C-alpha cells in the first residue's frame, strides 16, 4: 500500500496550465472511439491527459499472478507471470480516477524495475513508459463499471465513466503495459488537434 504525490508538471485540471481485471465479469462498455498515437506527438498517461480534476496524490497496490488467457491474448506472447498494478488518483483526499495495469514479469527484470520500491514502479507506469520512442493505442468507451473496478474506493456517485483501454509499446512494437483507466464522465475531457 503506497501513496505518492505526483510530479506537479504532470497534474491536470482546471487550475493547471497544461492542457477491469480479467475476472470474467460482464463488460458493459460500448460506443468505442479509437485514438491512434502519432509518433511526432508526445504521449502521456491518460489520467493526466483526460481528467479535468487537479490530482495531488496517487495510491498504489500491486501483486504478481499467473496470467489469464485474456491477459496472454493482450500481450500476444507468453509470459510466466504478470505484475498487476492498481492506482487510485486523488484530489484533496477524494479518489477521482482509477487505473489497472498489467506488465509481463520479464519486462520488470529486463528494465531493472525494483518491485521493492513502489516509487520506481509508479515512476515507470506514470512517466517512463511514455518516453518519446514509445507509442500507444487507445480505445475510449463508455462504462458503468468504474466504481466496481476501483474496488477500494467509490470514484463517483454516478455510474457513468469513460474507460480508456491502452496498450503501450516500445520502439520494436513489443507491448510493455496493458491498462484500463477509469475517469468519471463528469471529469473527462478529450482535446484533439487535427
Language-model features, listed with the residues they occupy:
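C-terminal regulatory/effector modules of DNA-binding transcriptional regulators
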Residues: 70, 76-81, 91-94, 103-194
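HTH-adjacent hinge/linker in prokaryotic transcriptional regulators
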Residues: 1-79, 108-118, 122-134, 189-194
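A generic signature of intrinsically disordered, low-complexity regions enriched in glycine/proline
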Residues: 31-35, 42, 90, 163, ...
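A short glycine-rich, His/Asp/Glu-containing loop-to-beta-strand
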Residues: 55-61, 85, 91-101, 183
Amino acid at each position: 500500500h503506497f501513496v505518492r504525490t505526483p510530479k506537479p508538471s504532470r497534474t491536470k485540471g482546471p487550475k493547471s496550465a497544461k492542457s477491469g481485471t480479467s475476472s470474467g465479469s460482464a463488460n458493459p462498455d460500448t460506443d468505442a472511439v479509437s485514438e491512434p498515437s502519432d509518433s511526432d506527438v508526445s504521449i502521456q498517461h491518460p489520467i493526466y491527459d483526460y481528467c479535468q480534476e487537479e490530482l495531488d496524490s496517487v495510491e498504489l497496490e500491486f501483486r504478481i499472478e499467473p496470467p489469464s488467457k485474456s491477459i496472454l491474448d493482450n500481450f500476444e506472447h507468453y509470459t510466466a507471470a504478470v505484475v498487476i498494478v492498481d492506482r487510485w488518483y486523488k484530489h484533496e483526499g477524494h479518489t477521482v480516477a482509477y487505473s489497472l495495469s498489467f506488465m509481463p514479469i520479464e519486462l520488470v527484470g529486463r528494465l531493472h524495475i525494483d518491485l521493492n520500491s513502489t516509487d520506481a514502479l509508479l515512476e515507470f507506469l506514470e512517466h517512463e513508459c511514455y518516453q518519446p520512442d514509445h507509442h500507444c493505442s487507445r480505445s475510449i468507451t463508455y462504462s458503468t463499471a468504474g466504481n466496481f473496478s476501483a474496488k477500494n474506493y467509490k470514484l463517483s456517485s454516478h455510474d457513468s465513466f469513460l474507460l480508456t483501454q491502452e496498450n503501450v509499446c516500445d520502439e520494436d512494437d513489443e507491448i510493455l503495459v496493458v491498462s484500463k483507466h477509469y475517469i468519471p464522465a463528469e471529469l473527462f475531457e478529450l482535446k484533439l488537434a487535427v
